[in-house]
């Protein structure tokens, strides 16, 4: 009888703790690393939301500790750390890893996707299931979810960019191999550079321009060291929410289900925030003294023509590249 009473009291206390958001010690503590600063709102806020959902829905059995702002690893180091098991989870950029897995360059194909939602539709339809997910799992990384991260624009310091010829001879920072090739075709001199190094490089004149999404310019305060942006929506980046495969396999099925469901919700949450962000970004840049130009159809046509050979270049890197391109076009 005493044992029954104690059990009932324990259950009541546990129910009270859970309802108030207080949990017992976690059975599984996972380390999540991202280089994103907290100023990268539409990217990092859904990650915090994901971690919170997992904790609540698992009744505290899983706790994900998020280390942001490159506290553990930089953007180009995250995937390797995930493979090795130095961290349990991350949301690396595909663009940063296209040199290792060229198929990731599909998001960087110029003017392939007309909008973030079109890109997300292709991702949700299974774009990465054509081989990318399988290749990563073979290296010990399980992809849980892939989310559209936003289109790349052209930033200039001391000069405007209205046509490809405006980039001729300019030193431009890029983040991926396909974007690098596109800038070469436009006549620029590309150099690979992480977003955290852009401010100082622009300030010192090490680079003259960069191809980056809008969130980089605002999140890194690049408006303080450059004065022109041309909106071209040339290509995209994505973030893939992933977990070390050994970590994943140690989790029981019920907790895997909790984590997967929360991960699936992340992409739609990020998409909504991204679309709102793009509406507001132009005004914020202009308030900070940046000339913000939206490329006209004629101007876009010139850029499209200049960088079109990127497709053939990429096909040379990826034997079944047409499979990815055709799928992307049909599933927007």
Regions found by a protein language model. Give the residues of each.
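N-terminal secretory/targeting leader peptides
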Residues: 10, 25-119, 127, 134-332
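Bacterial N-terminal signal peptides
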Residues: 8-20
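Positively charged n-region of N-terminal signal peptides that target proteins for export
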Residues: 1-7
């Amino acid at each position: 009888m005493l044992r029954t009473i104690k059990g009932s009291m324990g259950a009541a206390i546990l129910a009270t703790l859970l309802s108030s958001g207080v949990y017992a010690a976690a059975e599984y503590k996972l380390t999540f690393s991202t280089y994103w600063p907290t100023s990268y709102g539409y990217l990092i806020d859904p990650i915090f939301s994901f971690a919170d959902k997992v904790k609540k829905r698992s009744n505290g059995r899983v706790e994900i500790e998020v280390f942001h702002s490159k506290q553990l690893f930089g953007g180009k180091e995250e995937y390797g750390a995930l493979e090795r098991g130095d961290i349990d989870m991350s949301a690396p950029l595909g663009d940063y890893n296209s040199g290792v897995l060229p198929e990731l360059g599909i998001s960087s194909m110029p003017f392939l996707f007309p909008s973030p939602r079109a890109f997300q539709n292709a991702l949700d339809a299974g774009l990465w299931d054509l081989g990318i997910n399988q290749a990563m799992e073979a290296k010990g990384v399980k992809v849980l979810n892939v989310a559209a991260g936003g289109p790349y624009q052209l930033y200039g310091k001391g000069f405007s960019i209205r046509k490809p010829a405006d980039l001729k001879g300019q030193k431009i920072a890029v983040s991926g191999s396909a974007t690098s090739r596109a800038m070469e075709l436009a006549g620029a001199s590309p150099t690979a550079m992480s977003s955290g190094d852009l401010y100082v490089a622009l300030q010192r004149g090490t680079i003259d321009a960069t191809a980056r999404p809008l969130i980089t310019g605002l999140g890194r305060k690049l408006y303080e060291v450059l004065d022109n942006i041309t909106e071209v929506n040339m290509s995209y980046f994505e973030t893939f929410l992933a977990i070390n495969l050994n970590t994943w396999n140690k989790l029981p099925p019920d907790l895997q289900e909790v984590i997967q469901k929360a991960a699936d919700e992340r992409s739609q949450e990020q998409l909504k925030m991204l679309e709102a962000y793009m509406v507001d970004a132009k005004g914020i840049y202009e308030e900070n003294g940046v000339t913000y130009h939206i490329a006209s159809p004629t101007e876009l046509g010139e850029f499209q023509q200049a960088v079109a050979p990127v497709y053939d270049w990429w096909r040379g890197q990826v034997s079944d590249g047409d499979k990815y391109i055709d799928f992307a076009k049909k599933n927007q």
